[in-house]
């Protein structure tokens, strides 16, 4: 903890050694966060770069959360800004009656034996809007109301896109399980 305090002080003072250490400590984890949102490694690297530039030019960490949580929040915001700029956050509205019922994977015993890499690949294959809502809902634990506000969409659109993401993921999971059984 004492080392983290020194790191924070160094970053606030603009010390290159502290910035380098911060980048070394968090860049791999934050690249994974950026990739979860963008679904494209080149874009994830761009977002990561922009996020760290933002952190280093305006080190506004106030200590209200852990340093890792704050950096993650910056990277999520950068990822959402990137998706908005690229117009990749779809505002597609799917009516719930058009969506199939999806069994709960935990009830059906599905998902066992799937690697984290495979799960991340499934997430990366989701359409941009669905992937964004899925990440915010599942990993960032945001409500549909919060997601709607962040993405400037209707709350129902958030719900629909999460359902669509689950449906696509379920289809991928079943196909993966079938290929493993062969």
What are the language-model segments listed below?
Residues 1, 81, 89-116:
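Internal acidic/polar
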Residues 7, 23, 31, 41-58:
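Conserved RNAP core-binding helix
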Residues 8-32:
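A short, charge-rich alpha-helical start-of-domain segment used by transcription regulators
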Residues 12-13, 49-67, 86:
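Sigma70-family region 2
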Residues 40, 143, 153-157:
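Helix-turn-helix DNA-binding motif, specifically the short coil turn and the N-cap/start of the second
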Residues 62, 73-94:
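Arg/Lys-rich amphipathic alpha helix in sigma70-family domain 2
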Residues 133-137:
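A short pre-motif secondary-structure segment
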Residues 171-178:
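Conserved small/polar residues in nucleotide/adenosyl-binding loops
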